[in-house]
Amino acid sequence: MNKPVTLLLATLLAPLSGQLCAQESVTMDGKQYSTIEVNGQTYLIPDNGSKKRVARSLDSKVPQQTLRRGDVLMQGAASPELTVSGTLLVEADDASAKALATRHGLNFKQSSGGIALLEAKPGTDLNAIATKLKSEGVNVQIELSGAEQQPK
């Protein structure tokens, strides 16, 4: 009788534990970092020391963390630092990319081969814009730059 109850509890709690771990805090070399998801990968971002409480809605979703131009990210202790450039890469032709840029308050930089570069103004939350674009069915990536970054 205990085995089915335990299995049922584990099944019910598994999704919740994943959400609770999604925004965790990590300490390395005496510095505090929090996790952030960018382009489907988890990175570490320096925690500025603020002890903000995370408000959860009734569906238990954690609000998305903001990401701005100049933010520095790391994948781990030994990984190089990556800097958020403020540019979004979107899969769109020239006309569509220009329309997206206008609609979302971005600057159209250039387009080639169906990929356009859209630049955000300083202080813009890139995660919020990327989420909006994805909800519109647009393939989007937030550009990260680093001295040792190489394509996979």
Swiss-Prot record:
Against Pfam families, the record matches this protein to: ORF_2_N
| Compartments in which it is found | Periplasm; Secreted
What's known about how it's activated or inhibited? Degraded by ASP after secretion and dissociation of the ASP-ORF2 complex.
The cellular component terms of Gene Ontology attached to this UniProt record, alphabetical and capped at eight, are: extracellular region; periplasmic space
Q: Signal peptide location in the record?
A: 1-22
- What UniProt keywords are attached to this protein's entry? Chaperone, Periplasm, Secreted, Signal
Share what the entry says about its subunit structure, partners included.
Forms a complex with the serine protease ASP in the periplasm. After translocation of the ASP-ORF2 complex from the periplasm to the extracellular space, the complex is dissociated in a pH-dependent manner.
Comment, domains: Contains an N-terminal extension, a central body region and a C-terminal tail. The C-terminal tail, which inhibits the protease active site, and the N-terminal extension are both critical for binding and folding of ASP.
What function is annotated for this protein? Required for the production of the active form of the Aeromonas extracellular serine protease (ASP). Acts as a chaperone that helps ASP form an active structure in the periplasm. Formation of a complex with ASP in the periplasm also inactivates the protease activity and likely protects ASP from intrinsic proteases. Dissociation of the ASP-ORF2 complex after secretion in the extracellular space generates an active ASP.
Q: In its UniProt entry, what is this protein called?
A: ASP external chaperone
